[in-house]
Amino acid sequence: MSRGIIIIGSGFAARQLVKNIRKQDAHVPLTLIAADSMDEYNKPDLSHVISQSQRADDLTRQLAGEFAEQFNLRLFPHTWVTDIDADAHVVKSQDKQWQYDKLVLATGAAAFVPPIAGRELMLTLNSQQEYRACETQLRDAQRVLIVGGGLIGSELAMDFCRAGKTVTLMDNAASLLASLMPPEVSSRLQHHLTDMGVHLLLKSQLQKLEKTEAGIRATLVSQHSIEVDAVIAATGLRPETALARRAGVAVNRGVCVDSYLQTSHPDIYAIGDCAEINGQVLPFLQPIQLSAMYLAKNLLGGSAPLKLPAMLVKVKTPELPLHLAGETQRHDLSWQITAESDGMIAKGMSGEGQLRAFVVSEDRMKEAFALLKTLSV
């Protein structure tokens, strides 16, 4: 492989892939190109930066130069890739171009900002770079509106509340974590956030944001309005697919790949938050770790289809943490819920009596691995 492997991106997926490639081949040329600094940080830490009084720079774990030296890489930070010529095997930026044998898209996903009037007043916390841009405003803000009551929104609401801020959490749905589990299961977290002082605005839709002398006025479709100092969009992620489209590879919600992490072009692959694996977008750490192991083998001449076991998803709400697994979002499951002072176990059973999903909280999380073994997938 004389021209080697190019990876576009520098996040968790790209780094895991580099480490797995180097375990098997110390010498294949590896080049990483990314728009950011390429310094390493732990993205899940962004859910806890406010309560822990962390600045953006405190999150840095390893500088880009150290990473390059450790794994024998060529790095091109602060570099925007503008085009990919898939047939010629060339990646282009404004003033450079690189040839490759194999190309990996690890471009991640961007925070979705609702298309409302005043959307430019919304902040996002999807990267160290984004946090760096707004950390002073967030630290100084006393009244915070978080739009989106999913996994990230719920984590942020608890964190800001623990930091002593006045928090409003808004969602279109009638319950929190609505895309992950039914309301009877998420209600324990919902009640706890309310007890902490988080003001929930459920079944509510934001219409517009306006700058005022006192801060920001958020007006709902119902015409109810609230004054806040900062508004955070936690309304989900959209896989970054623009480069894949330019390369002419198949795209749906994400960059379409098969079990080998291969796109519709045989020498272009995708991994991480940007990838749609056999129809599924899986923006969680464990699938990415496993994808990196299999993709490293395939890039180096192997043929190993990715096999994903039942996996835990963790909701990092420290005062009431949750672990979930299986098809928790299915509407045809019968839920058996045991809730006690030390935690909750909720089992989603199929009509045939099979365990298809579960959610555990607090001290009952220690039972998660035993439940994983009995989960029907």
Swiss-Prot record:
It comes from the Bacteria. Keywords: Cytoplasm, FAD, Flavoprotein, NAD, Oxidoreductase. It catalyses: 2 reduced [nitric oxide reductase rubredoxin domain] + NAD(+) + H(+) = 2 oxidized [nitric oxide reductase rubredoxin domain] + NADH. It is found in: Cytoplasm. The keyword Chaperone does not apply. Pathway: Nitrogen metabolism; nitric oxide reduction. InterPro entries: FAD-bd_OxRdtase (IPR050260), FAD/NAD-bd_sf (IPR036188), FAD/NAD-binding_dom (IPR023753), NO_rdtase_NorW (IPR023961), Rbx-bd (IPR041364). Pfam families: Pyr_redox_2 (PF07992), Rbx_binding (PF18113). One of its GO terms (molecular function) is oxidoreductase activity, acting on iron-sulfur proteins as donors, NAD or NADP as acceptor. It is an enzyme of class 1 (oxidoreductase). Its EC number is 1.18.1.-. GO terms for cellular component: cytoplasm. Its main location: cytoplasm. Gene3D superfamilies: 3.30.390.120, FAD/NAD(P)-binding domain. Its cofactor is FAD. One of at least two accessory proteins for anaerobic nitric oxide (NO) reductase. Reduces the rubredoxin moiety of NO reductase. Belongs to the FAD-dependent oxidoreductase family. This is Nitric oxide reductase FlRd-NAD(+) reductase. It comes from Salmonella heidelberg (strain SL476). The lineage of its organism: Bacteria, Pseudomonadati, Pseudomonadota, Gammaproteobacteria, Enterobacterales. The gene is norW.
